[in-house]
């Protein structure tokens, strides 16, 4: 374990460019990675925080086919959206790269060639699924079927997104082509494989022994399960035309498998950054005094904890990751996030609909971070955390301090008198917070760390509430100077240690307190809070109060919930499958049915039942009683006068002691609600027959 690293290489999982960034990506990977990187920089560490767009693989070619464009068109579109979203959200990558770029192609090709020349691969002929209609092999997501582990009928050829199991396409039960829907055949092809089974002893020693105490339990547990089940050789090449061409003899028509190509993107991104900054990239990947940390979601654990480390080990020149603090999944309003189903809160849309409120989303996502188990994002919780915590605690404290300092002293920090016991205790608590928060961040407990940040704001609020300077100002002006001086120390500390969590708020607060320019060496940093006598001195001029956070109203939340309901309805309609046709009926069978328009003239819910309603229906030939199972869908008073379609010559049937003399025709909408089948034209009278 590297306890005193000289530098840090921080990677965030490469987002896949077949769609924009959503809150699940942010909570799982990018917000915690950004908190960690900002924190390290504030401690003076040499940090390379890299990421980039993952632009190869089958889903992109499928999307391109559907949209009638090239794969390059698809990745160009989404790379632009993703990169701008990250920039606007304040994610401070030192470099954001692209795997379709030349630096990456060269780096990945060289990586493969060295392993090939060193004899690290095995070459085998295997039978792969092949679509005869499309005339191509079905790699990865070109094929779907039933997962052999959990029974999910929509598993992909590389992974089941329901249980997280990594698969080969030939593992699927009842596979079918995602291109044509055809049942594929098996056809022989030749590929290179990484023999993971040859590295089991290395992985057991390195992970199961070496990282048992410092890796997160969810990560360690999944890795142990994989190793215990026994590892198999895994193909590193694919029969595709989109990707990095296999750079050795026999590689025609083949590309590097995206799981092999993508993590090398961290190295190529570091190269781009180092070249731009005039630095040597190699120490960030090859020096034992560098700490390498991968931030990922749980669906990437196997790639970053087993496969990529084996690649690095087999290559021979690279360091191994010190930690892989993978998060679980974030759900949305109790349902799993889905890009394909549009069940998501998209970052670029959030930034448009909630301008200048990046920190609110950062705060809520960190507060609900799925660090060891899946967690849920709800708009109700989003509103509550903003209004009850950011506005009522953090914002309220800062506003009171700055307003009172301007009111009593024209914005000039007062000189303090002798500290009381409560002052001493408050300052001592203040000075302890940086190390407490640092300890949580260093252990990748970002939710816990942010909770302590809010506790510091609570400390400030409680201090002011207990000391009541607005009352004392009339009787003890000297005491008020000391109170405001102590409160300003807390406000100043908040401006510093909020930066990793709430960077936009931190910048506003520093400006409000008129802190030294951030480019200066004298700018307060993390450690200064616990070591410096005072963070803001008597005689210092601060600025005017500005609201750091605004209350979020119910109407804003209703708008977001309506968007989700519209998505839910659209998905239900798309998923609605027609009932299979019943057996053939003759024309004579049809003519036996007396279908006619009726009007409901009375309605009441049947006592002691949930579903049944007793209706009196005017059929044009008589008024009759019909018992219908519609009580859970309609109120009696709402359907009186409603025109309906009645099967009038159905044999009477007794239901709960009431004779039912017909049947009302109904259907279901996409949400499962019953709908009357009735004429939509006015002037159709009761008794009109339906032919």
From Swiss-Prot:
Q: Which cofactor does it need?
A: Zn(2+)
Primary enzyme class: ligase
Q: Which residues form the tRNA-binding domain?
A: 589-691
Q: Which residues bind ATP?
A: 339
| Cofactor binding annotation | Binds 1 zinc ion per subunit.
Give the motif span ('HIGH' region): 15-25
Give the EC number(s) listed in the UniProt record: 6.1.1.10
Q: Which GO terms describe its biological process?
A: methionyl-tRNA aminoacylation
Which superkingdom, per the lineage? Bacteria
The places in or outside the cell where this protein is found are: Cytoplasm
Q: InterPro entries under this entry? A: aa-tRNA-synth_I_CS (IPR001412), Anticodon_Met (IPR041872), Met-tRNA-synth_bsu_C (IPR004495), Met-tRNA_ligase_1 (IPR023458), Met-tRNA_synth (IPR014758), Methionyl/Leucyl_tRNA_Synth (IPR015413), MetRS_core (IPR033911), MetRS_Zn (IPR029038)
**Which GO cellular component terms are attached?**
cytosol
PROSITE patterns in the cross-refs: AA_TRNA_LIGASE_I (PS00178), TRBD (PS50886)
Give the location of motif 'KMSKS' region in residue numbers: 336-340
Reaction(s) catalysed by this chain's protein? tRNA(Met) + L-methionine + ATP = L-methionyl-tRNA(Met) + AMP + diphosphate
Residues bound to Zn(2+): 147, 150, 160, 163
Q: Pfam families of this UniProt entry?
A: Anticodon_3, tRNA-synt_1g, tRNA_bind
Q: Which UniProt keywords apply?
A: Aminoacyl-tRNA synthetase, ATP-binding, Cytoplasm, Ligase, Metal-binding, Nucleotide-binding, Protein biosynthesis, RNA-binding, tRNA-binding, Zinc
Keyword Electron transport present in the record's keywords: the answer is: no
Function (record text): Is required not only for elongation of protein synthesis but also for the initiation of all mRNA translation through initiator tRNA(fMet) aminoacylation.
* UniProt cross-references to PANTHER family, sorted A to Z: METHIONINE--TRNA LIGASE, METHIONINE--TRNA LIGASE, CYTOPLASMIC
What protein family is recorded? Belongs to the class-I aminoacyl-tRNA synthetase family. MetG type 1 subfamily.
* Name of the protein in question: Methionine--tRNA ligase
Q: What is the lineage of its organism?
A: Bacteria, Pseudomonadati, Bacteroidota, Flavobacteriia, Flavobacteriales
